[in-house]
Amino acid sequence: MLLWLFEHLSGYNSSFQVIRYLTLRSLLSILTSLAIGLMLGPVMIRKLQALKYGQAVSSFAPENHAKKMGTPTMGGVLILMSIGISTLLWADLSNPYVWIVLGVMVVFGAVGWADDWIKIRYKDNAGLPARKKFFWTSVASLGAGISLYVIAQNQPNPIHTANMLDLLIPFFKNLSIPLSAVPLGIAFIIFTYLVINGASNAVNLTDGLDGLAIMPIVMVAAGLGVFAYLAGDIRFANYLHIPYVKYTSELVVICSAMVGAGLAFLWYNAHPAQIFMGDVGALALGAMLGTIAVMVRQEIVFAIMGGVFVMEAISVFLQIGSLRMRNKRVFLMAPLHHHYEKQGWKETQVVTRFWIITIMLVVLGLMTLKLR
């Protein structure tokens, strides 16, 4: 929005052309979302307390979680609002990728909000019926996959860059799984669906301790922002042997907004948390990360950088599978962070150590750019 305004004003004063610089707009995006989150955080907390939108604690949760009862939830609304406003202000709104990511954010956020509201309003831990949740998240993720396929079909691949529809294998030059070989983009669309929904649910499973999910979200968003910047510049794409994807540069602005909004939320979500993001935040932010990973064609690297999310999801699958097949537990409790709590780790220890793991994994993900 402001990009259009400043470009119009540059006709009267050339100094306004400075807004065209992506790095400047990305920095402003971080600062804007950070400021919105910090300023509106106390207002959101008081409003949620007045509405009695408090967190319910499961009887199966570790004993030390009882003190979290009644802590305001649905704080993800503030995160998404901060990201949305910052993106609309500083991103190039003629870029289709911007609208796809925002669309995914809105739909998954709405599903998460409905899920949270039903749990609070009706004291029903089941939340939104699974069929409705599956339908709307499928509409959003399949819609994103189809849109990306159509855009890719109208964008020729420059010489020396990888195919933007194939699954890139990190650590190897020019090695990929040819999703583009399947007619009509069926393999690509299905894969996109799995990545977006898998990321959304994995982040949601991780969001169980104060600050546990939001900091890895911030770090992974920053890492994906680097890939978005490089994939959107044909010179870097050629040099690094990654796909050149015309529209990804503007995703840096969105990733920056996610970083700023996430840090602002952490201010109030740090232990002891004053607010939780709820499903409205976790489902939407996870889906956004998955969508951006598909756009920059770095799904495997995304799984590496978001290894904490992957471990949390796998721990749940293993626990459920083992209980059904062997009637035995693999972990003391799932997701994984509760297992360590049961082993005697303090909540802050679990969170800090998972943050350290994420830092190392994000660095490893970035190293794949050169280690080939």
UniProtKB/Swiss-Prot annotation:
InterPro entries: Glycosyl_transferase_4, PNAcMuramoyl-5peptid_Trfase, PNAcMuramoyl-5peptid_Trfase_CS. Its cofactor is Mg(2+). GO terms for molecular function: metal ion binding; phospho-N-acetylmuramoyl-pentapeptide-transferase activity; UDP-N-acetylmuramoyl-L-alanyl-D-glutamyl-meso-2,6-diaminopimelyl-D-alanyl-D-alanine:undecaprenyl-phosphate transferase activity. It catalyses: UDP-N-acetyl-alpha-D-muramoyl-L-alanyl-gamma-D-glutamyl-meso-2,6-diaminopimeloyl-D-alanyl-D-alanine + di-trans,octa-cis-undecaprenyl phosphate = di-trans,octa-cis-undecaprenyl diphospho-N-acetyl-alpha-D-muramoyl-L-alanyl-D-glutamyl-meso-2,6-diaminopimeloyl-D-alanyl-D-alanine + UMP. Its EC number is 2.7.8.13. CDD domains: GT_MraY. It is an enzyme of class 2 (transferase). GO terms for biological process: cell division; cell wall organization; peptidoglycan biosynthetic process; regulation of cell shape. It holds the Pfam family Glycos_transf_4. The chain crosses the membrane at residues 25-45, 73-93, 98-118, 134-154, 176-196, 211-231, 251-271, 275-295, 300-320, 349-369. One of its GO terms (cellular component) is plasma membrane. Belongs to the glycosyltransferase 4 family. MraY subfamily. Catalyzes the initial step of the lipid cycle reactions in the biosynthesis of the cell wall peptidoglycan: transfers peptidoglycan precursor phospho-MurNAc-pentapeptide from UDP-MurNAc-pentapeptide onto the lipid carrier undecaprenyl phosphate, yielding undecaprenyl-pyrophosphoryl-MurNAc-pentapeptide, known as lipid I. This is Phospho-N-acetylmuramoyl-pentapeptide-transferase.
